């Protein structure tokens, strides 16, 4: 039997999605094969400090993993002298939000010369920015909701003018979103000017730039994409899933997603005609390729039921892995069990790392 691969499970972090990460990490820990991997859990607290745990100490944590315990060991940093602080061949990041999902962490791991699961620096950075992702995703005629951007540099007068302009152009309701955040953190539905002003102020607490977009009447559709391990092979796309929100918020808010998820239905497979389903799968594969994604991504759309028009919403290059997360659920329904999915992602990460190791970096 081959020696287990030393794998760092990295979770937590100082972002608005810290709590989501703890839940995702517990689910990943549960499904990783301990005979294949020597698992080294490393948590990041909300101040950015690192804490190493023993795998066996966390096995009883079924709902979410702890950040600090009596048995955890503080680390000086994730890297020491430019290399990973622990002996590991690969890092599995189960972290979300700025610094971790936007290419920063990926760049750090590149500098450390260690393999890591998921997209690289470029695709992570593009995917995290809703504006940039839409610009690339919609280059061949695919639509997205109309939107306008607002920077935190705008003064009170400029913010007020902006709010009146978007309301006049797009009508009500409007959606306000931080440009580079996920898990519905900082997202609001605004039905009038007072709500819009409050939503803009709150969203700017989480990001330097926000977008305000028109409301699209339609169904919320999600697809999971997995890179093909065959060189030059087309991305693999799961069956189509749908999110039906019965929550009073009226949309897939943070509360509806994580705190009161019983009021949200995840429908797999979504009931769509064959033609529309194929269009969605092709669009998801195209977007994955346009953004040069590696490993995995979840691609989200809105579909107008009457016209069957497809609107790209966003791409998530480090999707959630909680028990209710669409990414693993879609692959389970498509025929790839959760542990096999993790194995596949780790294998893809090792392939990319080995390729990078063979690149020429000395030109003399």
Swiss-Prot record:
GO cellular component, one term: cytosol
EC identifiers of the protein: 6.3.2.4
Subcellular location: Cytoplasm
Signal peptide: none
Cofactor dependence: Mg(2+); Mn(2+)
Annotated positions binding Mg(2+) 1: 300, 314
Organism domain of life: Bacteria
Catalytic activity: 2 D-alanine + ATP = D-alanyl-D-alanine + ADP + phosphate + H(+)
Chief site of localization: cytoplasm
Pathway(s): Cell wall biogenesis; peptidoglycan biosynthesis
Entry-linked NCBIfam families: D_ala_D_alaTIGR, PRK01966.1-4
Name of the protein: D-alanine--D-alanine ligase
């Amino acid at each position: 039997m081959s020696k287990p691969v030393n794998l760092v499970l990295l979770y937590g972090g100082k972002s608005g999605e810290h709590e989501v990460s703890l839940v995702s990490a517990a689910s990943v820990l549960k499904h990783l094969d301990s005979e294949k991997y020597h698992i080294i859990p490393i948590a990041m607290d909300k101040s950015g400090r690192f804490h190493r745990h023993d795998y066996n100490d966390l096995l009883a944590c079924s709902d979410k993993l702890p950040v600090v315990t009596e048995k955890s060991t503080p680390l000086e940093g994730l890297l020491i002298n430019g290399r990973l602080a622990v002996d590991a061949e690969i890092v599995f990041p189960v972290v979300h939000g700025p610094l971790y999902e936007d290419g920063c962490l990926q760049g750090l791991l590149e500098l450390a010369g260690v393999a890591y699961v998921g997209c690289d620096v470029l695709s992570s950075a593009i995917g995290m920015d809703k504006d940039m992702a839409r610009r690339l995703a919609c280059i061949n005629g695919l639509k997205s909701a109309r939107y306008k951007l607002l920077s935190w540099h705008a003064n009170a007068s400029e913010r007020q003018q902006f709010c009146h302009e978007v309301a006049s152009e797009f009508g009500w309701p409007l959606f306000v979103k931080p440009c580079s955040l996920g898990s519905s953190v900082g997202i609001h539905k605004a039905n009038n000017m007072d709500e819009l002003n409050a939503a803009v102020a709150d969203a700017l607490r989480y990001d330097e730039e926000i977008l305000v977009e028109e409301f699209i009447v339609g169904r919320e559709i999600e697809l999971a994409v997995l890179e093909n391990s065959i060189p030059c092979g087309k991305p693999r796309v799961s069956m189509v899933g749908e999110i039906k929100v019965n929550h009073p918020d009226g949309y897939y808010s943070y509360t509806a997603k994580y705190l009161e998820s019983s009021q949200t239905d995840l429908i797999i497979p979504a009931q769509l005609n064959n033609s529309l389903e194929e269009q969605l799968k092709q669009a998801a594969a195209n977007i994955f390729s346009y953004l040069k994604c590696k490993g995995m991504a979840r691609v989200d759309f809105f579909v107008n039921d009457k016209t069957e028009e497809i609107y790209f919403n966003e791409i998530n290059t480090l999707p959630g892995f909680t028990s209710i997360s669409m990414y693993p659920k879609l692959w389970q329904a498509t025929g790839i069990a959760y542990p096999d999915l993790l194995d596949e992602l780790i294998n893809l990460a090792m392939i990319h790392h080995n390729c990078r190791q063979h690149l020429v970096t000395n030109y003399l």
